[in-house]
């Protein structure tokens, strides 16, 4: 992936090759400027690669987008302040002309799933940052995607809220059984969430390591104190230092 800036060419991603299995939870991990968000945007058909091939459930990113194969959650919740929580969740279903009764049924199910069943009539500005991101996750799941793409969704939250939402996200993932591709620059977050961690290095962005995470599931906060958890963090950190 290349682009031009101020008269010079920048190589954002170079010879990146990876494969994610159905139902797998993987993280794209790396420092700022390593191309992890660019890679996610290519998967989401928000940016076009200058070379190479990308397949989403056997389809091109554009075909996957048009057939509602994936949902996406950004760093910012991107909610509409003039729409209620429930109306924000039903928005993609309205765009698909799903009948109102079905829209409401799905929204009610998702509100319960993300723990916001009592907040359906609230507005985004009445919610905390963590609650807003839960609404964004519910909206992404409204179309029942096979794949959930997440671009550092918890990076703006405090550490306590972030760790709690990590655990809640895994509970949601267990129920929906979608494939998740999660972008983060936090090593502990990647280890806690993932089946595998794809480590990207910068200048140009490239895949430098793939680390299996053999921690048992379900994962709980107590695992953050486990020696194996710290060993995996150290292993990944050593991979960065070796780049």
Predicted regions, residues:
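Conserved ABC ATPase "signature" region
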Residues: 90, 94, 101-119, 171
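Helix-to-loop junction immediately C-terminal to a conserved catalytic motif
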Residues: 44
């Amino acid at each position: 992936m290349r682009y031009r800036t101020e008269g010079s060419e920048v190589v954002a991603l170079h010879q990146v090759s990876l494969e994610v299995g159905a139902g797998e939870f993987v993280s794209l991990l790396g420092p700022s400027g390593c191309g992890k968000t660019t890679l996610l945007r290519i998967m989401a058909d928000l940016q076009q690669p200058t070379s190479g091939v990308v397949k989403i459930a056997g389809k091109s990113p554009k075909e996957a987008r048009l057939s509602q194969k994936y949902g996406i959650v950004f760093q910012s919740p991107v909610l509409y302040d003039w729409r209620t929580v429930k109306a924000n969740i039903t928005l993609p279903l309205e765009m698909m002309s799903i009948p109102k009764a079905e829209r409401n049924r799905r929204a009610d199910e998702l509100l319960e799933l993300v723990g916001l069943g009592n907040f359906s009539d609230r507005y985004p500005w009445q919610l905390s940052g963590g609650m807003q991101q839960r609404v964004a996750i519910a909206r992404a799941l409204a179309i029942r995607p096979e794949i959930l793409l997440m671009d550092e969704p918890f990076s703006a939250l405090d550490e306590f809220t972030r760790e709690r939402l990590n655990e809640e996200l895994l509970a949601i993932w267990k129920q929906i059984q979608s494939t998740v591709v999660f972008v983060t620059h936090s090593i502990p977050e990647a280890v806690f969430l993932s089946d595998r961690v794809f480590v990207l290095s910068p200048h140009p962005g490239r895949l430098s390591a793939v680390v299996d995470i053999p921690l048992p599931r379900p994962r709980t906060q107590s695992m953050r104190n486990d020696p194996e958890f710290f060993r995996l963090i150290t292993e990944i950190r050593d991979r960065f230092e070796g780049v």
